[in-house]
Amino acid sequence: MLKSLLAIGLGAMVGAWLRWGLGMKLNALFPAVPPGTLLANLIGGYIIGLAIAFFSASPSLSPEWRLLLITGFCGGLTTFSTFSAEVVSLIQEGRILWALGSIALHVSGSLLMTAAGLATFYFISGR
């Protein structure tokens, strides 16, 4: 149990630091749809896709690796709550089309990046 908690905690810490850094560097560039938040979700979607395929193909790996990468790192990196707050802020400002665009970018982009991560693994591994 302790190994699992440490794996999740370490992954979450690194993922959250990366998300914070992306937000600090990029969000001011385009406040209507903050690119740091979007990039965090897209990167996280891609990594999750790769990880799901990799861990499915590697069942002998310790489960702590999955916890570290998927639950911890990607959980700390991706940010549904920040995305939700940004969309609500756009709606409150009367910028409905920007809010809808942000929703479309985050949701479709994350799903496409997850599929791309899966496809990348299958392409590289020849499966």
Curated annotation (Swiss-Prot):
InterPro entries: FluC. It catalyses: fluoride(in) = fluoride(out). It holds the Pfam family CRCB. The keyword Cell membrane applies. Its main location: membrane. It is a multi-pass membrane protein. Keywords: Cell inner membrane, Cell membrane, Ion channel, Ion transport, Membrane, Metal-binding, Sodium, Transmembrane, Transmembrane helix, Transport. GO terms for biological process: cellular detoxification of fluoride. GO terms for cellular component: plasma membrane. Na(+) binds at residues 75, 78. GO terms for molecular function: fluoride channel activity; metal ion binding. The keyword Ligase does not apply. The chain crosses the membrane at residues 4-24, 35-55, 68-88, 96-116. It is found in: Cell inner membrane. Na(+) is not transported, but it plays an essential structural role and its presence is essential for fluoride channel function. PANTHER family: FLUORIDE EXPORT PROTEIN 1-RELATED (PTHR28259:SF1). Fluoride-specific ion channel. Important for reducing fluoride concentration in the cell, thus reducing its toxicity. Belongs to the fluoride channel Fluc/FEX (TC 1.A.43) family. HAMAP family: FluC. This is Fluoride-specific ion channel FluC. It comes from Pseudomonas putida (strain W619). The gene is fluC.
